């Protein structure tokens, strides 16, 4: 303690005759173990800012000829102080590396926190995808069957993949929140279905006025009001979006758009739905238009641009490739670069499966409910058959029951059903060892 507080070396010739320091603990240790602790040399270790970061302590200098314990000489103290200086440099370098890694990961967390705050619906995605990616990658390293049985990762490889997973959607920091969180087809900053509802109320009022004025009969009024309510219910349902919109439903939206007229604040007669509203309400699947889908897809371009602009150290040089490939397909029809399976690393293909499975099972999206295990695996299996995801990784995902491990941590009990693997598209039993 004295060496640390005084920043001075302490050279004790013999602990048993030394009066300036309390060596009762040392003597008790010697008595218990039979060891003889006599000469001590304690040297403080200082970093580049002259701060004490540790001590180097040597015990029992020995005479090279007789082997007897003797005090540490001045030359030995000088040598020890030189070694302590070198040790301090090495320790400082290690601490600096640890601090830089901690700072770097804090910046990653900062970016993800900003994305989470923008979009609470997809907030957990940035954390769940890297977790599932690592689960799958670790399962691949453990598998002893199939084409991937020789795949291995070191701890550095795992760290690199984890960092890539955490950064895989960093480009979303610029994506407009009303596009990311678009829960219904007519939603922009707010859901425009309320405007459509208001127009229906205007149409109903006009019909009631027409009946009062004798332009239509009471029976005609009742029939037309029923049609208005039917059309309103249809548009409300259509606005939600879904897996697929039928041709007849698209035609009905277009028919409704011109079936009713309403007068705007300027006194102009307008079609019931604007061209933009028709375009949005006739989105075939989901809630995004082609233009909005392009805005969403742009996040991966930006992710790659951001990551490739960074001066990565040698052990992290693959981060842009791993993070930037999770929207590619095995048949080369993905985006942004149209890479094929052979042009992608196993790690990037792992992240592709993780990104899809997380999205299928996520229960915090505004536009859909989280799917069950059976539903999610069935969709993923069809993607295997359609050359969307890597077939070998899908097999490992199923064989090693990675989906079960993930489900226990991140899925609701009602989503975790009993999976009959024989009914999952693309499933093949594992080969014999």
Model-derived features: positions:
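Short alpha-helical interdomain "coupling" segment at the junction between an upstream regulatory sensor module
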Residues: 89-108
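Output-coupling edge of small sensory domains
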Residues: 43, 48, 59-61, 342
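Regulatory sensory and allosteric helical modules in signal-transduction proteins
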Residues: 1-36, 264, 282-283, 289-290, ...
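Histidine- and acidic-residue-rich, metal-dependent catalytic cores
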Residues: 106-433
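A short, aliphatic-rich beta-strand micro-motif
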Residues: 38-47, 54
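Regulatory loop-to-helix N-cap segments in sensory/regulatory domains
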Residues: 23, 36, 51-53, 59-82, ...
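Signal-transducing coupling segments at domain and membrane junctions
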Residues: 13-39, 61-71, 329-340
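Amphipathic alpha-helical "output/dimerization" segments
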Residues: 51, 67-92, 159, 346, ...
């Amino acid at each position: 303690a004295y060496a640390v507080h005084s920043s001075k070396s302490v050279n004790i010739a013999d602990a048993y005759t030394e009066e300036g320091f309390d060596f009762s603990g040392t003597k008790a240790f010697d008595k218990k173990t039979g060891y003889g602790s006599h000469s001590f040399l304690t040297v403080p270790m200082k970093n580049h800012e002259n701060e004490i970061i540790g001590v180097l302590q040597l015990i029992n200098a020995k005479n090279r000829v007789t082997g007897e314990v003797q005090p540490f000489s001045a030359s030995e103290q000088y040598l020890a102080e030189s070694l302590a200086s070198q040790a301090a440099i090495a320790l400082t370098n290690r601490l600096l590396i640890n601090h830089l890694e901690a700072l770097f990961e804090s910046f990653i967390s900062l970016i993800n926190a900003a994305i989470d705050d923008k979009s609470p619906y997809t907030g957990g995605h940035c954390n769940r995808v890297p977790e599932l990616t690592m689960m799958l990658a670790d399962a691949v390293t453990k598998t002893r069957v199939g084409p991937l049985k020789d795949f291995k990762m070191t701890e550095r490889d795992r760290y690199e993949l984890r960092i890539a997973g955490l950064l895989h959607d960093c480009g979303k920091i610029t994506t407009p929140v009303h596009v990311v969180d678009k829960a219904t087809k007519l939603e922009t900053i707010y859901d425009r279905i309320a405007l459509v509802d208001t127009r229906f109320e205007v149409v109903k009022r006009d019909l009631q006025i027409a009946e009062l004025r004798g332009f239509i009969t009471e029976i005609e009024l009742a029939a037309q009001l029923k049609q208005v309510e039917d059309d309103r219910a249809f548009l409300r349902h259509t606005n939600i979006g879904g897996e697929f919109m039928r041709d007849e439903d698209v035609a009905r939206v277009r028919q409704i758009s011109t079936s009713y007229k309403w007068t705007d604040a300027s006194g102009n007669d307008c079609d019931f739905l604007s061209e933009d509203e028709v375009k949005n309400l006739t989105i075939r699947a989901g809630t995004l238009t082609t233009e909005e889908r392009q805005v969403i897809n742009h996040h991966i371009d930006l992710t790659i641009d951001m990551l490739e602009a960074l001066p990565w150290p040698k052990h992290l040089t693959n981060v842009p490739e791993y993070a930037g490939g999770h929207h590619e397909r095995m048949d080369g029809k993905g985006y942004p670069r149209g890479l094929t399976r052979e042009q992608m690393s196993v790690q990037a293909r792992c992240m592709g499966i993780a990104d899809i499975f997380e999205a299928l099972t996520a229960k915090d999206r505004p536009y859909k409910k989280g799917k069950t295990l059976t539903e999610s695996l069935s969709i993923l299996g069809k993607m295997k058959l359609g050359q969307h995801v890597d077939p070998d990784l899908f097999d490992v995902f199923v064989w090693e029951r990675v989906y079960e491990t993930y489900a226990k941590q991140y899925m609701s009990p009602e989503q975790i059903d009993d999976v009959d693997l024989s009914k999952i598209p693309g499933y093949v039993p594992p080969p014999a060892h």
